[in-house]
Amino acid sequence: MQEIGILENLQKSLSLKESMLSYEMLGKSLSYNPYLPRVIPQIKDCVFVTPDEVLGKLLEENTRTECVIVNFKGLYEIGAPSVFDLEVLGLLRRHASSLIVHQDLFISHYQLLESLVQGSDGVILDEELLKEDLKGMAEFAWRLGLSVFVETHKPDYTHLKDLGVLGVLEKVPHSQNQKKIVFLD
């Protein structure tokens, strides 16, 4: 039941954004974007945060880390997120040298383009949510220059290597972050 509400909130948020700024205009805004996606090497130091924690944890404390993974998924549990919520990615990009990976409920090319415009270096796609659309979304993200990671519950990652996925998000039960990035060779 909660899953249906989350997807409805996602659709509302996406519809509102697209009504304010069309896909074509969002694409054209890339020509004014000062932040090209950076290549993500096999990093060891990742911090997982929510959008609210970016201001308090990272910018105010000036935390130094190789990579920041900003998880927007929780925003859909409480309603349709604000159209301005992704601006935290741009703020982080301007004020921190860390690589930025955007984790969200990605279901459209519009969202991937928006992530790039806001300053992300990579995205985490949810295999369970996308199912057969995973390949198309991964290919589009790669064409944009974004590094692609996948959240999966499958123990075998062979099929993901064929898609050009850089790594997977794994659950780690007794760690501070509860998750970690595992790079595919």
Task: Give residue spans per PLM region.
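Short beta-strand elements of ligand-binding domains
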Residues: 101-104, 126, 150-152, 182-185
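Hydrophobic, well-structured mid-protein blocks that either form specific transmembrane helices
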Residues: 97-102, 106-144
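Glycine-rich phosphate-binding active-site loops on the catalytic face of alpha/beta enzymes
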Residues: 69-74, 117-133, 167-176, 183-185
